[in-house]
Amino acid sequence: MTIADNKKAFFDYFIEERYEAGIVLEGWEVKAIRAGRVQIKEGYVVVRDAEMFLIGAHISPLQSASTHINPDPVRTRKLLLKADEIKKLIGKVEQRGYTLVPLNLHYTRGRVKCEIGLAKGKKQFDKRETEKNRDWDREKARIMKGGVKE
């Protein structure tokens, strides 16, 4: 079940490969995610010392969050991947033009997982072409349905 999607990533990048990673979360973050108070549009993934971290994802704390902790909505969260997957991704990210972006948050067997994508940035004309194709697909669907009036 999907919790949050990053639609902006599909508009700004060509997604070449996808990986599923676990996330190290605190208790208040899990409760807030279950309540749907998460936004990953501004998030990105970095590699530090052969470990991966999700930066910029915003998890808004609930009002009922504990009083003895100070919740940080945009803290850096560690991503959990297998060592060989991390090595493979490090090699590909070091190539020019590749980056790692979070695509969505979802549940797998009751655990919150983050799907990350190996992505290459789109140029402005690529974005315009994507928009034209999307509009044409909508228009085709409308024509096939018989809803065009001239």
UniProtKB/Swiss-Prot annotation:
Protein name per its UniProtKB record: SsrA-binding protein
Pfam (any one): SmpB
Any one Gene Ontology BP term: trans-translation
Renumbered residue ranges of the record's region Disordered: 124-150
Family statement drawn from the similarity comment of this UniProt entry: Belongs to the SmpB family.
Q: Which molecular-function annotations from GO does this UniProt entry contain?
A: RNA binding
Q: Which InterPro entries match?
A: SmpB, SsrA-bd_prot, SsrA-bd_prot_CS
Protein origin, superkingdom: Bacteria
Q: Which HAMAP family match?
A: SmpB
Q: Which UniProt keywords apply?
A: Cytoplasm, RNA-binding
Name any GO cellular component annotation: cytosol
What role does it play?
Required for rescue of stalled ribosomes mediated by trans-translation. Binds to transfer-messenger RNA (tmRNA), required for stable association of tmRNA with ribosomes. tmRNA and SmpB together mimic tRNA shape, replacing the anticodon stem-loop with SmpB. tmRNA is encoded by the ssrA gene; the 2 termini fold to resemble tRNA(Ala) and it encodes a 'tag peptide', a short internal open reading frame. During trans-translation Ala-aminoacylated tmRNA acts like a tRNA, entering the A-site of stalled ribosomes, displacing the stalled mRNA.
Q: Give the subcellular location.
A: Cytoplasm
